[in-house]
Regions:
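Proline/glycine-enriched tight loop/beta-turn segments at coil->beta junctions
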Residues: 83-88, 94-103
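Glycine-rich nucleophile elbow surrounding the catalytic serine of serine-hydrolase chemistry
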Residues: 191-202
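Mobile cap/lid helix-loop segments that gate and shape the active-site cleft of serine hydrolases
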Residues: 214-264
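Conserved hydrolase catalytic core segment
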Residues: 204-210
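N-terminal targeting or regulatory segments adjacent to alpha/beta-hydrolase or S9 domains
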Residues: 1-88
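Generic beta-strand/beta-sheet core signal
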Residues: 132, 190-192, 212-217
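Alpha/beta-hydrolase fold nucleophile elbow
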Residues: 181-193
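Cap/lid segment of the alpha/beta-hydrolase catalytic domain
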Residues: 99-178, 224-227
Length: 264
């Protein structure tokens, strides 16, 4: 890396407010945290969809699971409302016993549900495995990006698909935390690639999430926009091919990544 590149790769100072003053004590961190979050949510993601007044979980089906003694399968409907209602499916595999159990939640069921081996491992550790299809919340198709899902319910705003999918995780949290079999203090979220980008946003904007486990989230996730290794995903790549994941303001920083007031 040459000297010019080194200068451009300097990351924004985490413990300094936008006005230049230092975060001098732990008590000041929540204010700085909110400052960073507000910038990122606005510039990178185009905001977040509105939070509904209420969210419920309706049980559609509950049964035992053949070959897994004591394990139960619950298929439920997450329903928001009362104004501008929206619903999507959430499935749970519950370990033996009454709980309350910790939860591993993933929205990557759009690709495929987890394998039997992974499910058995999660259940064997005494965790609930919760899964939903994030493309029920917003489509993952460039040419049809705002035609269905919550875009029909909340057409206002400039939020991209990542914000919509993160909203889905938040509504699952709403539905789960009041259940007697759920340990609301131990809920983890996980996702891969674009799902990893999604859970990083979901975890950063909902402190009920105890653990965020993102896998291969790339640029716009755990990877930097400023610092790039060989064949890294870049902001330019994202804007050329997948701009609908993000808010419209981010495009202005292609080739000007060093001017972003944050990096991730």
């Amino acid at each position: 890396m040459n000297k010019a590149s080194e200068a451009e790769a300097v990351l924004p100072e985490l413990l300094r407010f936008a006005d230049g003053t230092a975060v001098a004590a732990p008590a000041a961190w929540p204010r700085r945290r909110k400052e960073i979050a507000d910038l990122i949510v606005d510039i990178e993601y185009g905001g977040l969809p509105p939070t509904p007044a209420e969210t419920t979980l309706e049980t559609l089906h509950l049964s035992s699971v053949r070959g897994l003694e004591g394990v139960r399968f619950l298929s439920g409907r997450v329903q928001t409302g009362p104004d501008r209602p929206f619903a999507f499916l959430l499935t749970l595999l519950l370990p033996p016993g009454d709980g309350p159990f910790p939860v591993v939640l993933t929205g990557d069921a759009c690709w495929r549900y987890v394998t039997d081996a992974v499910a058995a491992d999660v259940l064997g550790r005494g965790f609930i495995l919760a899964q939903f299809n994030r493309t029920e919340i917003a489509p993952d198709v460039y040419s049809d990006a705002r035609s269905s899902g919550i875009y029909r319910v909340y057409p206002e705003g400039a939020y991209g698909a990542l914000s919509a999918w993160a909203w889905g995780y938040h509504r699952c949290l709403d539905a789960l935390v009041g259940q007697p079999f759920v340990d609301a203090s131990r809920i983890a979220v996980t996702g891969h690639s674009r799902g990893g980008k999604t859970v990083l946003l979901a975890g950063a904007t909902d402190e009920r999430i105890a653990l965020t486990a993102a896998n291969n989230s790339g640029a716009g996730g755990a990877g930097c926009f400023r610092r790039q290794g060989p064949q890294s995903e870049t902001l330019g790549d994202l804007m050329r091919n997948l701009a609908y994941w993000f808010g419209p303001k981010l495009r202005a920083y292609v080739g000007r990544e060093a001017e972003l007031p944050f990096d991730q």
